From Swiss-Prot:
UniProt name for this protein: tRNA(Ile)-lysidine synthase
Taxonomic source organism: Brucella suis biovar 1 (strain 1330)
Catalysed reactions, semicolon-separated: cytidine(34) in tRNA(Ile2) + L-lysine + ATP = lysidine(34) in tRNA(Ile2) + AMP + diphosphate + H(+)
Entry superkingdom: Bacteria
Keyword check for ATP-binding: yes
């Protein structure tokens, strides 16, 4: 008896989508996914359009032919198919991570172009076990949040749902299914290249591990992650816990912070450091412990710079403060019709007809701008403006959007951006992200 497509896919609500993107490389996992998904969608009264997308990473000479063969197989079975290529220059280091980032970027673009609400991938139980073992080796201990491994559901770029329905299905079960159907697959030789981390783990420690024991450890790590998240969600329900100014400086109630468990404190302050610094990931375990010790008064310094964030401990009832440090702030061009993210902290939308450069103002430049406009603001507000974006036109400072009473150029709109949530948001953290956003908001206003 084969696998049940209904049992696998029904919990994900794919039937509500206009279209579904299946990521298909031609390997056994993705082909197993494709044909099980096709069978499931055929049971629906009004099924979404199924589109198979193959990403050619251009890393091997054979990859173009393999992508073409996936297309021929899809054509034979009446499945829409397209190939997307990663044509960018390849990095000398971190190739696997760069390829993964490019792959998801291309898949998200394909989903948006097709109006697809879901991207579905063929990650299996074997991949889940390998992910746990890889992260455990990196973390050095068993308390890391990443040991919850992959979430069955995630949100990509704030709008496209990612589903991993096969995390409880073994690779062998998928191969048995394909064999039963008479469908051949291709083994990517890079999956056996021990220069890469995952193949090294797959052929080494994963081959010797007790799979059931690892899955139990994943469940335990997931439960611990949920407990820490729930503690923060509960704390954030109180409006007094967390505040923010227009430039993104956050104020954390010291008493609320002290009332949390050490693990929840490390998560909370690490999360705020990531948001303040515009980073996509939490600081490492050691960095999070260092922040927590400083804010709890266990370590002497009252200020700490971590992950691009400047963190200051509040004294005598004052809140702890988190803001961007004034280093490595970017300069970006904003042309008509463009939507860009600046410094991982702000989204700019330009629906007007003018082009600008976005950059932080220099101190003297800001002082002169304030003087020429007849404004005088206190030092604290000036410091906040120095880590905020300003708009330049023709090389001249044209607008300081967060200055009290400032007028934004026509057609320019700014929103707050949370890099840690807005690119890849694991399902583990949906409730936490909603609670944080409810406190911090997206709207930007003047610094007052």
């Amino acid at each position: 008896m084969g696998l049940s497509p209904v049992n696998i896919f029904k919990p994900f609500g794919l039937g509500r989508a206009k279209a579904v993107i299946a990521a298909v490389s031609g390997g056994s996992d993705s082909l197993g996914l494709l044909f099980l998904l096709k069978d499931y969608l055929s049971t629906l009264e009004s099924p979404p359009v199924l589109i198979a997308v193959t990403v050619d990473h251009k890393l091997r000479a054979e990859s173009a032919l393999e992508a073409e063969n996936v297309g021929l197989l899809c054509q034979k079975h009446g499945i829409m198919h397209c190939v997307l290529s990663w044509d960018d220059p390849k990095p000398a280091h971190g190739l696997a991570a760069a390829a993964r980032t490019a792959r998801y970027r291309l898949l998200v673009q394909a989903a948006r172009d097709a109006g697809a609400g879901f991207i579905v991938t063929g990650h299996t139980e074997n991949d889940q076990i390998e992910t746990f073992l890889m992260r455990k080796a990196r973390s050095g201990h068993c308390e890391a949040r990443g040991l919850a491994a992959m979430s069955p559901r995630s949100l990509l770029e704030g709008s496209v749902k990612l589903a991993r329905p096969l995390l409880t299905v073994s690779r062998q079960a998928l191969r048995d299914e394909l064999t039963r159907r008479g469908i051949a697959w291709v083994d990517d030789p890079s999956n056996a290249n021990i220069d890469y981390e995952r193949p090294r783990v797959r052929l080494g420690v994963a081959a010797e591990a007790d799979g059931q024991e690892v899955l139990e450890q994943i469940a335990q790590a997931g439960a611990a992650r949920e407990r820490d998240n729930a503690a923060l969600v509960e704390a954030l329900a109180d409006p007094a816990t967390l505040g923010v100014d227009a430039a993104g400086m956050m104020f954390l109630n010291a008493d609320c912070y002290a009332a949390l468990s050490p693990g929840a404190r490390q998560l909370f302050s690490g999360l705020l450091a990531s948001i303040a610094g515009g980073r996509r990931f939490l600081p490492g375990d050691g960095e999070r412990r260092r922040i927590e010790r400083m804010l709890s008064g266990q370590d002497a310094p009252r200020r700490l710079t971590v992950f691009g964030a400047l963190i200051e401990r509040g004294e005598k009832g004052a809140p702890h403060r988190f803001r961007r440090e004034r280093r490595n702030l970017p300069k970006l061009d904003l042309v008509p019709g463009q939507h860009i993210v600046w410094d991982g902290r702000f989204c700019f939308f330009n629906s007007g007809g003018r082009s600008f450069e976005i950059a932080p103002p220099g101190r003297q430049e800001l002082i002169d701008f304030l003087k020429n406009s007849g404004r005088d603001i206190e030092s604290r507000r000036c410091e906040a403006l120095l880590i905020s974006p300003a708009l330049y036109e023709g090389g001249k400072l044209a607008s300081v959007p967060f200055l009290p009473g400032a007028e934004w150029p026509q057609g320019v709109h700014i929103e707050r951006h949370f890099a840690i949530f807005d690119h890849v948001l694991p399902g583990h953290d949906f409730a936490l992200a909603q609670a944080v956003e409810a406190r911090l908001g997206r709207a930007c206003a003047e610094i007052s």
